[in-house]
Every structure is written in C-alpha cells, then in structure tokens.
C-alpha cells in the first residue's frame, strides 16, 4: 500500500471519528429518571423487542406506536408513555437508526404484522411526528395519528390530535399551520400552557427551545391524559 493511500485512509478514519464524536456529544440522552422506568411499574411491564421497547399495560385491544424526535434516545420518553400504557393503551417506543426517524419510517410495519391488536395509533415527537404522518399517509392499518409538537408533510385521512406547549420555540409554526389543510378528517388541538419542546421526554434542555413554565411531570401528565382521551373516543 502506497504512502499517500495510507495517509488518505488515515484522514478518512480520523474524520469519521471526529464526526461520530460530535454526533454523540450532541445526542440527547435519557435522564436517570427516565431510565428508572426500564424496570416497569406495578401496572406496566417493559420489555426489549426488535423495534425498541414494548410497554405492556392492562389493555389488550389498542396499541400506540411512537417515533422519537431527532437525535433523542427513545428511552427518554418512557415516563409519559408508561402513564399512557397504564391507562390501557400498550405502547411501542421505536429505536430509530442513529436516532433519526426518517431512516426508519416503516418500522411500524413489523410491529403491526407481528401483533394482534384491534386498533393502532401512530404518534411522534417533532421529526418523529413528521415521519409518523408519512407512515400514516401510505398505511391502511392505522386508526389515528398523534402529533407532539410536530406537523404533516403529506395528507392523512385519519383523526389527528396535535399537542404542543405554548413556550415551544423549536416547532416551526409556519409549517404547522400550513399542515392543518392536509388533515381531511377530525382534528383536535391541545396546547399545554407553559409547556415547551423538550419536556415531552426526559433528556434535559434542547437547543433553541424556551424554558418551560411548568414541570416536565405536569407537561407529560397533561399530554398523556389528552392522548388517552383522544384514543378512547374512537371505538
């Protein structure tokens, strides 16, 4: 191997290491509070599955499939979705390739194909919501869509719940308002007063977000209650 070729390979390897290091450094990791939920609760059993985590609560009729936000570890969302599972809606938290949902848009396919629920709802936070909407656009197996501080890029023909915080300065409101015209079925909007972008998960503060005026626990409780209310109104 020539000297110049060796140098070129070394430069490429070093560049990859630097890029990987920067990515890992800017990735949003779950807090200890979130990770404690890996042990489950009295009402919810948490298990590892091929697509991520399965939160098995007392219900057996309805499942919620969740796509996380960009660069956020899916385990960071355990607290809120454990609340939802405890109310009778089993939840799948999907582990996306390098934490970008656009690299795993169709991951819901295997969940739906390998389970036996009567009803499926898609849900996503931020970029995960955009990709959940993308999935719903070409799937006939979904009963509804929940967008958490997110918006649509393609039309959907199922009921939609949109939830976001009043202090969210990450959500692109121009895109959000434009996307409302893509909802051709029932649309429900719920704004959490004082809530921000990051506190739907437990991963700390997020770049370009504004401080929340309420606790993460309060924000997640309001969101979980509204999601349960939305799902249970559709027989």
For every predicted segment, state its role:
Residues 61-69:
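Short beta-strand element of the alpha/beta-hydrolase
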Residues 80, 171-182:
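Short alpha-helix in the alpha/beta-hydrolase fold that links the catalytic acid
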Residues 1-17:
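N-terminal Sec-pathway targeting helices
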Residues 123-132:
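Gly/Ala-rich beta-loop-alpha elbow adjacent to hydrolase catalytic centers
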